[in-house]
């Protein structure tokens, strides 16, 4: 039996804002944007070549709105691996991505925490070879 994680849901306040950040600032591919109803779309974004994707879900209830940016209780919830930390850190900084710390070197690789415009925390990581 083969299984994979295909999508991970990420609540956003607005589909357009989510697409603007993940596609515009991070350079992810827009894999799908299908209208399901007047208020709901199926929006998937992912880094080039990724096997799994983020499913951007526009919050539509008070509980969902309250969870935007805090889906992991203030912890880093997402991990973006790269083969060239310096290249991607520079490109993301130039695109206006807000890093919360300077790059640091850990036993597992080079890492820096950044946040999306909604408050979700990410690690940009170049794993140690």
Residue spans for each PLM region:
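Sequence-level detector for tyrosine residue identity
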Residues: 15, 22, 105-108
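Vicinal oxygen chelate
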Residues: 1-9, 29-81, 87-117, 125-129
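Short Gly/charged-rich anion-binding patches and loops
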Residues: 17-18, 87
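Conserved active-site tyrosine of GNAT-family acetyltransferases
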Residues: 18-23, 92, 119
